[in-house]
Amino acid sequence: GFYRSISVESNLAYKRRISEDTLIWWFKQGVSAQAVFHENKETLETGLQELSDWIGNDKFTIWSNGADFDIPMLAHAYTQHGIETPWKFWNSRCYRTYKNLPGAKDIRLPAIGVKHNALSDAYQQAQTVCAIHAELFGKKKAKV
């Protein structure tokens, strides 16, 4: 999977904001999740370029836990930096919607890795999507 830790300064330089609620939320998380504050940082622009390179082409399907938060913020960051968004808007998917489909609500997998680490959360969500798909459509579970 793809993971980068982005500097706060590079976000603030483009007038991106950090809410007080978000800071309070982070202070309430476990030590393992807070380790993100001690990682080597990249600029937002570098992270966006590397994500584009990792995605590779615009046929990529992008998922997030909510259609109106992560993907729009990421798309806005691309626009601010003058970088083309590496996915087409019609290839955006919502994990929250998928996990609440009829017949899927009881399918919950245990957390994988560090709770609230972006890569761990993404991996767990991808595993859950595969399990839901297998349950709803009778297919063998795909591996992520």
Question: Over which residues does each language-model region extend?
Answer:
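Substrate-recognition/cap helix-loop segment adjacent to the acidic, metal-dependent catalytic center
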Residues: 52-55, 68-89
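Amphipathic alpha-helical interface surfaces
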Residues: 40-51, 70-73, 77, 94
